[in-house]
């Protein structure tokens, strides 16, 4: 069974733990209890493949930022979460993405941008803004509500699909030998 190491990142209070607990336990946690670091495991079937999700729910608070490099090194894919009613959390996504790219030493890291709390009427980040940001990063964007469960599975499962595609790209890199080459090999004897 394939195991996927997923890391949930984002500013404090955006609902990272609520999303994770909703996926794992089908339960909405409405009281805010800042996370230092929690790990969850769940066996799921995605596109016909049984797999084990190893999800690391991380601290959003700045005082725990020193711990980020460590979990970013071990993660295979990242849910970058902001709250649609918190513009600052949306602006913070850029810092998380840059730190992930730096720690992974790669521009090609599986990520999904997640706009959480879409059940709330007081939106300050428009869907179009988030879609544009995700497009500029070349990653999917999904709106979620940990409260209603909307988009929760979709966000995590899309990240697994991104990791799968990333692994395939690494196994079969695009042919860089030029436009005229048809992958022919010449043998001179």
Swiss-Prot record:
The modification S-nitrosocysteine is found at residue 118. It catalyses: GTP + H2O = GDP + phosphate + H(+). GO terms for cellular component: ciliary basal body; cytosol; glutamatergic synapse; Golgi membrane; GTPase complex; nucleoplasm; plasma membrane. Residues 187-189 form a propeptide. Palmitoylated by the ZDHHC9-GOLGA7 complex. A continuous cycle of de- and re-palmitoylation regulates rapid exchange between plasma membrane and Golgi. InterPro entries: P-loop_NTPase (IPR027417), Small_GTP-bd (IPR005225), Small_GTPase (IPR001806), Small_GTPase_Ras-type (IPR020849). The keyword Hydrolase applies. A lipid is attached at residues 181, 184 (S-palmitoyl cysteine). GTP binds at residues 10-17, 57-61, 116-119. A lipid is attached at residue 186 (S-farnesyl cysteine). The modification Cysteine methyl ester is found at residue 186. It is a lipid-anchor. Alternates between an inactive form bound to GDP and an active form bound to GTP. Activated by a guanine nucleotide-exchange factor (GEF) and inactivated by a GTPase-activating protein (GAP). The modification N-acetylmethionine is found at residue 1. A motif (Effector region) lies at residues 32-40. NCBIfam families: small_GTP. Belongs to the small GTPase superfamily. Ras family. Ras proteins bind GDP/GTP and possess intrinsic GTPase activity. This is GTPase HRas. It comes from Gallus gallus.
